[in-house]
């Protein structure tokens, strides 16, 4: 099973490097690890340097890194670009697909940027089934966002792949700060 992290590096590179470290650590601990590949990961780029600076042993990480685009590595009909703006719900994980997690970290959220990129490339898209399995929290502190960090998306995928349970997977990856909770947690 393949998960490819697209490195769309904007201004928050240290956060992305940290998310890559967390994602990698979660994959190492997973009962069913994924094959990981960082694509468009240019040697000497800011994110490249930041990954080596922030992540001890990064050069020994058991994952592939390449400057190439995922479009050059995989058939387009095998690619599923995960984006919170997709109309398509990810219902299951297909071991014959390559799932793209867009490594976009930017404080000024660009609405539908990952969806737009996937459409421009004529790729299948899907979103995690947050709305289907979770409800909005009534807390006024929460702003109800389905946009997750790449390590959180990975945690959801990994837990689902292990348990085949979306509620368990979403509980593992969607923090309460996103403003969603499982219905049985609503009191």
Sequence positions of predicted segments:
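C-terminal folded domains that constitute the principal catalytic or ligand-binding module
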Residues: 96-187
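Eukaryotic short linear interaction motifs
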Residues: 8-10, 44-46, 88-91, 107-110, ...
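RNA substrate-binding interface of SAM-dependent RNA methyltransferases
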Residues: 1-88, 140
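Calponin-homology-like cytoskeleton-binding modules
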Residues: 81-83, 91, 95-102
């Amino acid at each position: 099973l393949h998960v490819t992290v697209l490195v769309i590096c904007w201004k928050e590179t240290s956060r992305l490097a940290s998310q890559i470290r967390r994602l990698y650590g979660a994959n190492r601990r997973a009962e069913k690890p994924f094959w990981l590949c960082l694509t468009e990961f240019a040697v000497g780029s800011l994110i490249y340097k930041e990954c080596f600076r922030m992540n001890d042993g990064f050069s020994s990480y058991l994952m592939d890194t390449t400057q190439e685009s995922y479009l050059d590595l995989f058939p387009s009909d095998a690619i599923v670009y995960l984006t919170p703006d997709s109309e398509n719900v990810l219902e299951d994980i297909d071991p014959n697909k390559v799932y793209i997690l867009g490594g976009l970290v930017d404080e000024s959220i660009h609405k539908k940027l990952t969806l737009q990129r996937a459409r421009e490339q004529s790729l299948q898209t899907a979103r995690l089934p947050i709305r289907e399995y979770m409800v909005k929290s009534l807390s006024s502190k929460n702003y109800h966002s389905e946009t997750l960090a790449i390590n959180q998306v990975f945690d959801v995928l990994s837990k689902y792949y292990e348990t085949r349970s979306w509620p368990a997977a979403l509980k593992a990856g969607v923090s309460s700060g996103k403003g969603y909770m499982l219905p049985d947690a609503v009191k």
